[in-house]
Amino acid sequence: MSKKFSSKNSQRYVVVHRPHDDPSFYDTDASAHVLVPVSNPNKTSPEADLRKKDVSSTKPKGRRAHVGEAALYGINFDDSEYDYTQHLKPIGLDPENSIFIASKGNEQKVEKKNIEDLFIEPKYRRDEIEKDDALPVFQRGMAKPEYLLHQQDTTDEIRGFKPDMNPALREVLEALEDEAYVVNDDVVVEDISKKTQLQGDNYGEEEKEDDIFAQLLGSGEAKDEDEFEDEFDEWDIDNVENFEDENYVKEMAQFDNIENLEDLENIDYQADVRRFQKDNSILEKHNSDDEFSNAGLDSVNPSEEEDVLGELPSIQDKSKTGKKKRKSRQKKGAMSDVSGFSMSSSAIARTETMTVLDDQYDQIINGYENYEEELEEDEEQNYQPFDMSAERSDFESMLDDFLDNYELESGGRKLAKKDKEIERLKEAADEVSKGKLSQRRNRERQEKKKLEKVTNTLSSLKF
């Protein structure tokens, strides 16, 4: 008879997949699952019993005396099972193997700033409003109309077109944008007659000019028209002959006492140039008026001929060729086409040293001009027209061979040899295509064929 089943002596198994490291994993005849024995969860193993005995033997019999003292030294770990204070030592006993770590104080937490506070004035911030128990200026991320009123340059009451505005207020607003109403604090408008009495004869020309502009800025009508006309007299064209003799005698005498280059540094020749240009502009202004005749300007010519300054060169005609323009510039030297003055200040009287330098410069320039003229003359003399009879006998055949075998590509920038296959493809494409380029190529081919027929017939004739 078989023994009865006993759960105490039974063995429990579970069905699991066969592991990959099993030698029978790749065997097709073996099953994919295996039985693995497991222990009874209700039955304790002898190893577990031994482990419990070891733990129970290590537990202290009494309660620790230092539980809770670690927190006094800044140690926030649970010291119910381990005494962390045994590693602490009094300060000064072993300075080589111990260090002092101070406990952390109560740090103030930094409040997070709101992005809205970066764009709001201090008096409109949230914390200030809460102190004053005022309403917030922002609601749901948008500014209220009360806050936007403070950001406007001009209030809505006077902004835009206001036909019913007070005329006095309108004039004030227009004056704020008009430069004519702007008061210049730097310019003091004073009566010129009172100032001349105080300062006397030492009143400078520059100060007079400032007072003139100050009076103009002050505006208003003139007190006495006759006095105003006498004070600001315009240029008199009738006295132009003797004006330079009366006013510039001392300045003209400076040019007679020049002996070396150092004397030229003390002469303000630029003032003469500015005065010369100013006189010409005044004369041109009077010439443009119809009341002045051309006969009245004849008296100006002698003074211009005796002037130290040279005449302004006439602007060249645009119809000149490039070579003629280049020659004219070389003859002028460093002088410009418009002003006639050079970088070497040719308006100054030339000394002996400067004259020698000018002569040497002219000789060098003339040498270059003669060289260019000789080259042009040689080209004109040695020029011979093309003569086909003087060329070699096979020259024509060489040209024909070159034109038949080579062509220009890339828009005429590249010379390449003709390809018969490409020409054949082009002809086939031109026959099918209806574009303008294809039609033009077809016409050129037809004309070429006609020309070849004519040449063949002429070559076959015997004379």
From Swiss-Prot:
Segments forming a coiled coil: 355-462
Top-level division of the source organism's lineage: Eukaryota
Span(s) of short sequence motif Nuclear export signal: 168-179
Modified residues (N-acetylserine): S2
Alphabetical list of Pfam families matching this protein: LTV (PF04180)
Oligomeric and partner information: Associates with the pre-40S ribosomal subunit. Component of the GSE complex composed of GTR1, GTR2, SLM4, MEH1 and LTV1. Interacts directly with GTR1. Interacts with CRM1.
Identification of the protein by name: Protein LTV1
Source organism: Saccharomyces cerevisiae (strain ATCC 204508 / S288c)
Gene label: LTV1
